[in-house]
């Protein structure tokens, strides 16, 4: 069962103005381009070097992927998980957002992959809503303790 507007406002009071009937809108803050290789071998993470694009207007080149962070930290309460879905305006503009699961107990700044699949540049302004987080209860879960915890 997905969590609705009233409970979302109680669970995530810092996001009250972004709560929708079935989720929480999240806004883009910083956008980065990849500047070199990365790897994941035998569970060893070597993230690629990044270069931050100059805000407040981000220009996404056709066929390119970018890492985007949201404008504030989030804390997912124990017993709940988040899934992140792209805003339909981006999809209608040939821009996809690739995401992961937000585990119970995660606290930190979320990052997503933006990919301009179109033939033309796409312009995105800092502060625009790019994803909607939907929240589900999770029974019998532990708490996130991975390397991206802040």
Swiss-Prot record:
**Which Enzyme Commission numbers does its entry carry?**
3.6.1.23
Q: Which GO terms describe its molecular function?
A: dCTP deaminase activity; dUTP diphosphatase activity
Single Gene Ontology BP annotation:
dUTP biosynthetic process
Name the UniProt key words of this record, in alphabetical order.
Hydrolase, Nucleotide metabolism
Q: Which reactions does this protein catalyse?
A: dUTP + H2O = dUMP + diphosphate + H(+)
Quote the pathway field.
Pyrimidine metabolism; dUMP biosynthesis; dUMP from dCTP (dUTP route): step 2/2
- What's the stated role of this polypeptide? This enzyme is involved in nucleotide metabolism: it produces dUMP, the immediate precursor of thymidine nucleotides and it decreases the intracellular concentration of dUTP so that uracil cannot be incorporated into DNA.
Q: Which family does it belong to?
A: Belongs to the dCTP deaminase family. Archaeal dUTPase subfamily.
Name of protein:
Probable deoxyuridine 5'-triphosphate nucleotidohydrolase
Gene from which this protein is expressed: dut
């Amino acid at each position: 069962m997905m969590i609705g507007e009233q409970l979302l406002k109680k669970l995530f009071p810092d996001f009250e103005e972004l709560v929708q009937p079935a989720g929480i809108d999240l806004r883009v803050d910083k956008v980065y381009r990849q500047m070199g290789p990365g790897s994941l071998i035998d569970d060893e993470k070597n993230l690629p070097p990044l270069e931050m694009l100059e805000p407040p207007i981000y220009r996404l080149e056709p066929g390119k992927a970018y890492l985007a962070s949201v404008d504030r930290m989030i804390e997912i309460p124990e017993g709940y998980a988040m899934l992140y879905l792209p805003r339909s305006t981006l999809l209608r503009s040939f821009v996809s957002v690739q995401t992961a699961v937000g585990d119970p107990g995660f606290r930190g700044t979320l990052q997503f992959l933006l990919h301009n699949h179109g033939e033309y540049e796409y312009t995105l302004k800092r502060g625009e809503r790019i994803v909607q987080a939907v929240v589900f209860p999770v029974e019998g879960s532990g708490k996130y303790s991975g390397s991206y915890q802040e």
